[in-house]
Amino acid sequence: MTKQSGVVWQIIYCLIFFIVLMNLYYLGREWLAKPAKLTLEKDGVQLYKSVVSPDKIERWRELCKTKKYKELKTEMHSDKNIQEVVKSISPEYILQDYIWIIQKSSVHTCHRDNNGKFFNEGQKHDSYTMLVYLESMDKCLGVIPGSHKSQYTNAVNITESVEDIICSAGDVIMFNANLVHVGTLTEKDDNLRVQMKVSHPDDLAVLNYYQNFNKVLNRDNNNPRILRQMQRSVSCTFPIVSDFTQSENISSSRGTDNGAEISSAQKLFSWLFYGRTDFYDLPNAF
């Protein structure tokens, strides 16, 4: 064996060791996952238990199954219990004209949401993302508590671990859009949940790209699970990378159905992390 080939094999062994180590770390975090007791003000995220009644859960599941998404949106936006969660921030806050039905798959890379104050010039108030779970999940959402307070404190997380929140059907999670968060990798890929946006009326003009926004995500992720685990771990170590793409994410958020252009870089990212170039180019629900 030549000296040069010996160096190559050393590099290969190091890469294999790193991959194994990252996966052991990720699996260890999954095994230790426990219910999180977090508050919206302090941690940037909060779990609200049993917001949706069993009858409405069944009703809304059926509306999703039969693709009656407009009817679903009307019922969810007018639901008294959901409105109480919205108003718990402040009586002035409202649901935006927005719904995103997630029937399959999840975003398994750490990121902040487009509607965060960090990324929208002229935005005066915090904006929030609400997730309504219509099925129980062993892990619903991964978060880095407190990361909403500064764009730079959790830009790189060498020792910081993501905390997985456990929830049941009918529960609601609401989080500050500035919060670093990530979808969970569970045994099932088709856990039904619905995402909505909660904002202050003063900011609707700035966040107008999320008005009349009605999307459905029902796509398989074609990448192997072990690769997704690695991508999740690396992206949550360096969430600052995602911050650099926010401007482009906002400009293309409405999708080609509404005339937005998806760049080559974004298509490449979608292919690398989700196995298809059009993963983020979602069709209109109605």
Located regions from the model:
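N-terminal Lys/Arg-rich, disordered targeting/topogenic segments
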Residues: M1-K3
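N-terminal auxiliary "cap/dimerization" subdomain that precedes the catalytic jelly-roll/cupin core
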Residues: G6-Y93, S168, L227-F286
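Short, solvent-exposed loop/turn segments at secondary-structure junctions
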Residues: V52-P54, I101-I102, E135-D138, H148-K149, ...
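Short, glycine/charge-rich beta-strand/loop segments that flank catalytic centers
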Residues: K73-S78, D97-V107
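A short coil-to-beta-strand element that immediately follows conserved catalytic motifs
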Residues: S90-W100, G142-V143
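A structural signal for short, well-ordered beta-strand segments
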Residues: D97-W100, M130-V132, M196-H200
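Catalytic core of non-heme Fe(II) oxygenases with the double-stranded beta-helix
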Residues: S106-C167, V206-N214
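Conserved double-stranded beta-helix
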Residues: S150-F286
